C-alpha cells in the first residue's frame, strides 16, 4: 500500500460523512489555496513516517509508522459546521478506520493553525502502521 493509495482511502472515507464540505488532497501549491467553498474544506496530506529498526542480515522487513494530517478550513469556529464540530466529527469517523494491509488509524495530535479574516484553520493528525518490505528481484547484485 503506497502513500497516495492510503491518502485516497482516507479521502473516500470522509466524503460521504462530510458532504457539506470540500474534501480533497492537500493542494500542490498551498500558498495559492483560497477557500471558495461556502462552508469549508478538509485537506488531507501525508506528513511523514518513521521506520522500525532492523538487525536483518538478509531479507529486510520493517514496520513503517505513517502520519497523515487533515487541515480543516472553516468560516466558523464554534457554530454549525465550525472548526470544533468538524474536528470532533473527523475523529469520530476516522478513529479505528482500518485500511487493508495497515493498522487502524489512531488520532495523535490536533491543534490550531491560523485565523485570517474569519477563516479558521485547524489540523488533526492520524497515524497508522504499514509493512515495509525489501523488494526482491531475481538476479539482483550481491555486494557480499
Positions of PLM-derived features:
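Generic marker of residues within folded, mature protein domains
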Residues: 34, 60, 114-116
Amino acid at each position: 500500500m503506497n502513500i497516495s493509495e492510503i491518502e485516497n482511502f482516507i479521502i473516500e472515507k470522509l466524503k460521504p460523512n462530510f458532504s457539506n464540505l470540500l474534501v480533497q488532497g492537500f493542494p500542490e501549491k498551498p500558498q495559492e489555496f483560497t477557500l471558495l467553498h461556502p462552508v469549508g474544506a478538509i485537506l488531507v496530506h501525508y506528513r511523514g513516517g518513521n521506520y522500525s529498526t532492523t538487525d536483518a542480515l538478509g531479507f529486510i522487513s520493517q514496520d513503517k509508522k505513517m502520519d497523515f494530517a487533515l487541515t480543516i478550513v472553516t468560516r466558523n469556529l464554534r457554530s454549525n459546521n465550525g472548526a470544533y464540530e468538524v474536528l470532533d466529527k473527523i475523529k469520530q469517523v476516522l478513529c479505528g478506520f482500518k485500511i487493508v494491509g495497515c493498522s487502524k488509524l489512531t488520532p495523535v495530535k490536533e491543534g490550531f493553525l491560523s485565523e485570517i479574516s474569519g477563516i479558521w484553520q485547524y489540523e488533526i493528525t492520524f497515524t497508522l502502521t504499514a509493512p515495509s518490505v525489501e523488494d526482491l528481484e531475481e538476479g539482483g547484485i550481491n555486494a557480499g
